[in-house]
A protein has these predicted regions:
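Loop/turn elements at helix/coil->beta-strand transitions in domains of secreted/extracellular proteins
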Residues: 77-80, 129-135, 160, 176-178, ...
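Bacterial N-terminal signal peptides
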Residues: 9-18
């Protein structure tokens, strides 16, 4: 599988079984899901993703750039989980990292990257690779934004032929060719993937937070972004050891590299 050079903030989503992309036949990073059985639940896959996925071109890039490739390229390179941070701008949604604006190109005069820009790239990718699916995890980046307005604009973009919007972990066949909506806020549509802030440096015996997706499915998250290297490795190892239990639990693990 291709790697993204000098990529910052990459995280891997580890689910309850480990079925690696390289176990699919050597066709392409663009369609590594093609030869995985369609009755496999997404919680039984190990799926790579990116953190602050839209930050290839971002204001104050030395501080806020987490990726040096576009979302289109990330998908072509095999990543299937996107971390999308949305902010209201008039009657539209744009992408930001904290207060830093994500831009369409590297020019400081470039306009803001919009939700439509990102969705168009994903639609194109899925049209070309119908065996694949993309988890689209949305966070409201500005706490002052009206959540109902954010949801209204987001929901207006949804075409049920192109999106999976149930609050239930799907099988691969249910999700192929579609965007899987996930939100970190309560919504009438999509998987509810929410967790409390985990920046505390305090070492916990069980460094994960369990949340309910629905009455029968759960989310375990390791997002200890303030841990030092040794403690972070311990947290990652714990997640690996405990992510084989069942396919009704999402295991979401953040770790950071630069290479």
């Amino acid at each position: 599988m291709k790697t993204i050079q000098k990529t910052l903030g990459i995280f891997i989503i580890l689910f309850s079984m480990l079925i690696s992309p390289i176990q699919a036949k050597e066709n392409s990073s663009s369609n590594w899901m093609e030869n995985i059985s369609g009755d496999t639940k997404l919680s039984a896959l190990s799926i790579p993703g990116t953190h602050d996925s839209a930050t290839q071109y971002v204001s104050l890039s030395p501080i806020f750039q987490c990726q040096d490739t576009a979302i289109k390229t990330q998908l072509e390179n095999g990543y299937r989980y996107l971390d999308i941070r949305l902010v209201l701008k008039n009657d539209d949604l744009i992408l930001k990292h904290n207060f830093a604006k994500c831009r369409k190109d590297k020019s400081i005069f470039s306009t803001s990257l919009t939700l439509d820009d990102v969705l168009n790239d994903i639609y194109t990718f899925l049209d070309q690779n119908p065996s694949e699916t993309v988890i689209f995890c949305v966070k409201k980046e500005n706490s002052k934004d009206d959540l109902n307005k954010v949801k209204s604009i987001l929901n207006s973009k949804i075409n049920t032929n192109s999106w999976y919007i149930e609050n239930r972990i799907p099988t691969l066949d249910e999700a192929r060719g579609k965007i899987i909506l996930a939100t970190r806020f309560k919504s009438e549509y999509g998987l509810y993937l929410n967790w409390e802030e985990q920046g505390d440096r305090t070492i916990l015996d069980v460094p994960h937070k369990k949340e309910d997706i629905n009455v029968s499915e759960s989310l375990f998250v390791q997002d200890r972004f303030n841990y030092g290297v040794e403690d972070k490795v311990q947290a990652i190892e714990y997640c690996l050891e405990n992510s084989m239990s069942n396919d009704s639990t999402f295991y979401l693990k953040f770790h950071i590299h630069e290479w």
